[in-house]
């Protein structure tokens, strides 16, 4: 699962526009996935669904390595059972899996941008331990973080080589036109 709605960059504050966009996107997602397909989606479930997304997408609560079902339920003012049921029903996983998915996607972003070393990555992404990070990353991505990083670096190098090749070809074609 990728980030559900918004790609984020490091920011210190969330604008009302970002919040509004997320909530509208969540409402559309709700309609497409649940309301229009005969799945019983209660209004109160929709409100909690949007609240969960807001806290994950905008507030990035998944970066807290001590975030638990109890702590998250207190944060969003609901009970643990109800939060667990909504996550299970509408995200098709449990809360731990959902948080780890967000953490791994965030780790992929940091690796892709070259903003973080592999050593500091587990802590920056909200994992309590390095082993939990490696296990979750491998399960979700299908390869180790080191292998993912190597693939990203190879892709970047390949993109650079293609860009240089295309630029050189374009330059040579332009020089040929000038000589004619």
Question: Which residue ranges define each predicted feature?
Answer:
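A secondary-structure capping/hinge motif
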Residues: 87-93, 136-148
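Conserved small/polar residues in nucleotide/adenosyl-binding loops
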Residues: 166-176
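The DNA-contacting recognition helix of HTH DNA-binding domains
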Residues: 80, 129-130
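Short hydrophobic/aromatic patch on the recognition helix
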Residues: 83, 132-133, 137
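Membrane-proximal linker segments that couple transmembrane helices to downstream signaling/catalytic modules
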Residues: 5-112, 161-164
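Central "turn" residue of the DNA-binding helix-turn-helix
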Residues: 77, 126-127, 174
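Residues that mark the N-terminal boundary/hinge immediately upstream of a DNA-recognition element
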Residues: 68, 94, 117-118, 129, ...
């Amino acid at each position: 699962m990728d980030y559900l709605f918004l790609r984020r960059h490091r920011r210190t504050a969330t604008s009302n526009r970002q919040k509004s966009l997320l909530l509208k996107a969540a409402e559309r997602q709700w309609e497409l996935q649940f309301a229009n397909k005969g799945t019983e989606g209660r209004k109160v479930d929709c409100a909690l669904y949007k609240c969960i997304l807001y806290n994950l997408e905008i507030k990035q609560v998944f970066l807290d390595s001590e975030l638990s079902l109890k702590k998250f339920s207190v944060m969003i003012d609901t009970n643990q059972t109800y939060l667990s049921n909504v996550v299970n029903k509408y995200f098709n996983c449990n809360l731990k899996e959902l948080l780890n998915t967000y953490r791994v996607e965030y780790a992929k972003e940091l690796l892709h941008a070259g903003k973080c070393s592999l050593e500091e990555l587990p802590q920056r992404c909200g994992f309590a331990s390095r082993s939990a990070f490696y296990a979750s990353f491998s399960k979700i991505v299908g390869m180790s973080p080191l292998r993912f990083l190597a693939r990203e670096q190879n892709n970047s190098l390949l993109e650079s080589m293609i860009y240089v090749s295309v630029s050189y070809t374009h330059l040579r074609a332009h020089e040929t036109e000038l000589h004619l």
